[in-house]
Amino acid sequence: MSEKYVVTWDMLQIHARQLAQRLLPVEQWTGIIAVSRGGLVPAALLARELGIRHVDTVCISSYDHDHQRDLKILKKAEGDGEGFIVVDDLVDTGGTAKVIREMYPKAHFVTIFAKPEGRPLVDDFVVDIPQNTWIEQPWDMGVMFVPPVCDKK
């Protein structure tokens, strides 16, 4: 990855609210399935914005910190996804998205961020990201002091 895209908590909440607007009316949804772990925070934000209380998870392991590896399904939500919004933070190459589509063919699959290779696999997303960009999510970062530019020697 040659570029980094840093996401702040404020940006994430703004993007989630934009996505929630597109998912109205809420009456069409039975619940949300969050793709663990990346989709947990966006799913919580969407659940709040849409007033949805039925939230389940599908647990798929595909990354070891910053390296992609083989997919491993750890836990699956029941059903074919009918009436459910499946939420992940991003769609990258589409590996996880393909598995999600097979497990939940009737679900509405959304992400906050989408890269070109995976974009066709989601029903909706908010932000286009170049394929060669690494996304730094706010839950993966700590807050630290950075000295002013004029203090650097």
From Swiss-Prot:
Swiss-Prot/TrEMBL cofactor(s): Mg(2+)
Keywords: Cell inner membrane, Cell membrane, Glycosyltransferase, Magnesium, Membrane, Metal-binding, Purine salvage, Transferase
Functional pathway: Purine metabolism; GMP biosynthesis via salvage pathway; GMP from guanine: step 1/1; Purine metabolism; XMP biosynthesis via salvage pathway; XMP from xanthine: step 1/1
InterPro entries: PRibTrfase_dom, PRTase-like, Xanthine_Guanine_PRibTrfase
Chain sites annotated for binding xanthine: 92, 135
Binding site for 5-phospho-alpha-D-ribose 1-diphosphate: 37-38, 69, 88-96
Entry membrane topology: Peripheral membrane protein
Name the record gives this protein: Xanthine-guanine phosphoribosyltransferase
A Pfam family of this chain: Pribosyltran
